[in-house]
Amino acid sequence: MGATSRVVINNMSNNDLVTRTLLISQKQPGFIVVSRGGNNNLDEATVLSSGLSQIRAFNLANLTSISKPYDFETSGRLLGWGLRNSVGVAEHPVTGGIYSVENSIDGVTRQGTDIHENNPGEELNFHGYLNDTTDHQGGNYGFPRCFAVWDPNEIPDNAGLTVGTQFAMTENSTITDEICASNYTSPRLTFPAHQAPLDIKFNADGSEAYIAFHGSFDKTNPVGYSLSIVAFDPATGEPTEAASSTTALSDIMTNPDHKVCPDKCFRPVGLAWDSKGRLWMSSDSTGEIYVLQKSTSTPTATASGTIVTATGKPNAAGTAWQKSTSALCYGAALVVGGLLMAM
C-alpha cells in the first residue's frame, strides 16, 4: 500500500470464495457496495453475525482522517444475505436500484435423486436502493437452505414448485418448500443452472443489463460461455420479464459448439464500458479482450467468424483469435483481435 492508502473496510477474510466485488455508487456519491461470498462451513452462512454470504453498503463520506475502518460483519447497510457468491453487482443508471447475479451450488440431490443437471438456477437478485428508503433490503436469499427452481420437473415431490420459486434441498421439521417460499427472498429472475454469471453492467439508459456467463463445469451438456442481455424498463428499473420467465436472456455473443467447452471456448468474465459507449469483455481461459459496439444498421439474426491462428503471444494486443466463435448480435458490431466485423 502507498503512503496515501488506507483501509476503509476490514474483517472479511474467507477460506473459500475469496474475491470481493466492489461497486462505487453513481447515484449516491460516497457509497461503496461490497459483495462477500460464502466459506467452507455452510452453516456459518445461516448466522447473520458471521458476515458471510452477504452484500453490504458503506458510506465512505462518513469517514474522517482518524476514523477506524468499517467492520464488515457489524457495520454498513445490509442489502442482502444468504447469497452464496454474488460476483456481479450493478446499479441501475436511472433508478439507482442495486442488482446482483448469484452463482448457486453444484451437486444438488433431493430425496436421493440427483437433480444437479438443471437445478438450482442462477439468480438475478434485487437489493433496493442506496437512498433513504430501505425497501427490498436486508432479506435472506436462501443459501444454504433454500434455492431457486429452474426445472421443476427434475425435482421429486415438486407440488407447487415453479421457475423462480425457492425450494429446500432437504426438507425437515424446520425447513420446507413452503417455508423457503414464504420466509426467504426469491430472485427477480432465474437463469439456467451452472451458467456462472460473473459480471453485470447496465447500458447508459438502463434498458438492458449485459451479463457475462463464464460457463459450466458440472454439467453433462455445457451451458453458458456467453454474453447475454436482459431487457429492462428504463423508467421503473425492473426487468420486463416476469419472475417465472424462462426466456429473459438474449444471447449477444456465444461459442458455436458448447460440446467442446470449456477447453476450446472463450469464457466471459469482466465487463466495462468505455467513453465511446463500447462494451469491453474479457475471457480468462483464452487471455483475450472483446470489444462490442452497437450499430445503427439493420441487425441480422446471427453472424459467425473464423479466427486465424495468432502469431504473437496469446495475450498480446492486436493478435488474432485462436478459437472459432459465433456472435449472435442484435444491431451490434464486434471487434475481434483488432478486426471490426459488422453484424
Model-derived segments and spans:
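Asp-box/WD-like beta-propeller blade repeats and closely related beta-sheet repeat scaffolds
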Residues: 1-26
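Predominantly a core beta-strand signature of beta-propeller blades
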Residues: 3-8, 65, 75-77, 245-250, ...
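Short glycine-/Asp-/Thr-/Trp-enriched loop segments that recur within the blades
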Residues: 12-21, 79-82, 191-192, 259-266
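Hydrophobic beta-strand segments that make up the repeating blades of beta-propeller
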Residues: 30-34, 98-100, 209-211, 278-281
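Beta-propeller domain segments
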Residues: 38-40, 53-73, 84-85, 90-254, ...
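Blade-level signature of beta-propeller repeat domains, shared across WD40, Kelch, NHL, RCC1
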Residues: 120, 269-301
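C-terminal low-complexity, Ser/Thr- and acidic/Pro-rich disordered "stalk" regions positioned immediately N-terminal
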Residues: 296-318
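Cleavable C-terminal sorting propeptides in eukaryotic secreted/cell-surface proteins
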Residues: 315-343
